Amino acid sequence: MKELVNILDFLPEELGEKIKPMFRVKQIYQWIYQKYANNFSDMSSLPKDLRLELAQNFHFSPVKCVKNEQSKDGSIKYLFELIDGLRVESVLLPMKKEKINTEGKRISHARYTICVSSQVGCKSGCSFCLTAKGGLKRNLSTGEIVGQILWIKKQNNIPYERRVNIVYMGMGEPLDNLKNVSKAVKILAQNDGLAISPRRQTISTSGLAKQIKELGQMNLGVLLAISLHAVNDELRTELMPINKAYNIAAIMDAVREFPIDQRKRVMFEYLLIDGINDKLEHAKELVKLLNGIKAKVNLILFNPHEGSLYKRPSLENAIKFQDLLSNKGVTCTIRESKGLDISAACGQLKERAKEQ
């Protein structure tokens, strides 16, 4: 029996090499990404013989949702099973509620962020992250990355044209899977598809300096987020073993070379861990480290998970840390940890066992 190929792996020009004429590729993209077709037989504007040809050669269901949990704050965590039985988690984060005026008319739409996984597991070994506990199983294909987003939008009846933000902050190190992640960015941005601008897609990394430079040279227009979490190499190596390969100086050099839109900033994620990296002296060092860089610091209070020895700091301490940065001219926010009650917050995702 012929093995079917995932059509979500293909850019339009790649499909155009297999399917003629090109306007049919445009129609196929629109059926999949805009009309949310369930199968090729739904694509009524295509000739019957083309629909049959597509069904004989392609599929577009590389991920299957086997479980979902909804948080009190409205966040939804999805457990997806892949074709080989491995599993990843993704999260839909409601960022802004729909607004209705006194006359019952909608004056603004709800806004969402989708946190997507790029690998099954992760090899970075960060001591505070649950994903790292199981190690790396494999990279996700481009279609498996795109499939998470497509399924979530379809399941929640989010029209294709409705703006969503994509953050590659789920399971895995995105830059360890740069080829497939960068292609996913391009596919998601297609005007005949989901039309998610690269400026609405943020790629997070633990600090792979070489790949940061490679990503910059691609000129995709994506936003960059650096998981920093410490201001000196000794502490960062303790928290993040990847620092042995790429120390803070190497990361900052790569960041300085990264092309950023004049209106945008590089995001630095800083996980505050009680008694470890949350002192005001750390905040002062962070100010020095970011000198001369268009940066925004995103403070995250540590999210507890099974087996962790770290503690979550008080909000009071986090605000003091934030105030010091802000008073020194560093743009800084404290991230609200959405989905904490369903283990969907930062550092809490993992490959859940099949018995679940």
UniProtKB/Swiss-Prot annotation:
Belongs to the radical SAM superfamily. RlmN family. The active site is at residues 89, 346. S-adenosyl-L-methionine binds at residues 172-173, 204, 227-229, 303. Binds 1 [4Fe-4S] cluster. The cluster is coordinated with 3 cysteines and an exchangeable S-adenosyl-L-methionine. It comes from Campylobacter jejuni subsp. jejuni serotype O:23/36 (strain 81-176). Disulfide bonds join 115-346. Reaction proceeds by a ping-pong mechanism involving intermediate methylation of a conserved cysteine residue. It catalyses: adenosine(2503) in 23S rRNA + 2 reduced [2Fe-2S]-[ferredoxin] + 2 S-adenosyl-L-methionine = 2-methyladenosine(2503) in 23S rRNA + 5'-deoxyadenosine + L-methionine + 2 oxidized [2Fe-2S]-[ferredoxin] + S-adenosyl-L-homocysteine; adenosine(37) in tRNA + 2 reduced [2Fe-2S]-[ferredoxin] + 2 S-adenosyl-L-methionine = 2-methyladenosine(37) in tRNA + 5'-deoxyadenosine + L-methionine + 2 oxidized [2Fe-2S]-[ferredoxin] + S-adenosyl-L-homocysteine. Specifically methylates position 2 of adenine 2503 in 23S rRNA and position 2 of adenine 37 in tRNAs. m2A2503 modification seems to play a crucial role in the proofreading step occurring at the peptidyl transferase center and thus would serve to optimize ribosomal fidelity. This is Dual-specificity RNA methyltransferase RlmN. It is an enzyme of class 2 (transferase). Its cofactor is [4Fe-4S] cluster. SUPFAM superfamilies: Radical SAM enzymes. [4Fe-4S] cluster binds at residues 122, 126, 129. Pfam families: Radical_SAM, RlmN_N. It is found in: Cytoplasm. One of its GO terms (cellular component) is cytoplasm. Residues 108-341 form the Radical SAM core domain. The lineage of its organism: Bacteria, Pseudomonadati, Campylobacterota, Epsilonproteobacteria, Campylobacterales. Its EC number is 2.1.1.192. Keywords: 4Fe-4S, Cytoplasm, Disulfide bond, Iron, Iron-sulfur, Metal-binding, Methyltransferase, rRNA processing, S-adenosyl-L-methionine, Transferase, tRNA processing. Gene3D superfamilies: 1.10.150.530, Aldolase class I (3.20.20.70). Its main location: cytoplasm. One of its GO terms (biological process) is tRNA methylation.
